[in-house]
Regions:
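Sec-dependent signal peptide recognition
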Residues: 2-10
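Hydrophobic alpha-helical transmembrane segments of integral membrane proteins
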Residues: 13-14
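A structural motif detector for short, solvent-exposed N-terminal "entry" segments of globular domains
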Residues: 22-56
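N-terminal post-signal-peptidase region of extra-cytosolic proteins
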Residues: 23-27, 54-78, 98-102, 119, ...
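Well-ordered beta-strand positions in beta-sheet-rich domains
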Residues: 28, 49-51, 74, 113, ...
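Exported/periplasmic cell-wall-interacting domains
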Residues: 81-160
Length: 160
């Protein structure tokens, strides 16, 4: 009987950290471009908010490669990059099928490599102005924290 109790307690203590850690994942990320904020949501409630910088032409939906716009719409996190030119980067699933189709109709490239990332490792970048090529930038400390909240496939809604 004692061995069963010891095994049960050991089992609980071995699995508890994984259970607790898993409970901290975000359900969704919301980017409000006009407010320059990134919100982490869990069970429909905002649990954390961050100030952001956007693309150098932030108004409007990204249409083509090089336009400096940050896309708008529903996407998801499809990759975590821990060895990035921007400290840590979370790749966004832009372009989606609709973005690709719209670009094909106009015979242009929709662009790509849109990410939530930290500050540049090569140049001195700040969040005081919109400086990215269409990405969403936060501080290095913040991207470290954000990367712990999200998993691959976490939805991200980017709105005006």
């Amino acid at each position: 009987m004692k061995i069963i109790i010891k095994m049960t307690i050991t089992f609980i203590f071995l699995l508890l950290p994984f259970y607790v850690y898993g409970q901290n994942y975000a359900d969704m990320i919301i980017i409000e471009k006009s407010e320059r904020v990134l919100k982490i949501l869990k069970e429909g409630k905002v649990i954390k908010t961050y100030s952001i910088a956007l693309g150098f032409e932030p108004i409007g939906h990204k249409q083509n490669q090089g336009d400096g716009k940050t896309p708008e719409g529903l996407y998801y996190i499809n990759k975590k990059l821990f060895n990035s030119d921007f400290h840590i980067a979370l790749q966004i699933s832009y372009p989606n099928k609709w973005d690709i189709r719209k670009a094909q109709i106009r015979n242009i490239s929709p662009g790509g490599s849109i990410m939530i990332h930290g500050q540049s490792n090569k140049i001195n970048s700040t969040l005081d102005l919109d400086w990215t090529n269409g990405c969403i930038a936060v501080t290095n400390t913040e991207i470290e924290e954000i990367s712990k909240f999200v998993r691959i496939q976490t939805p991200i809604y980017i709105k005006k």
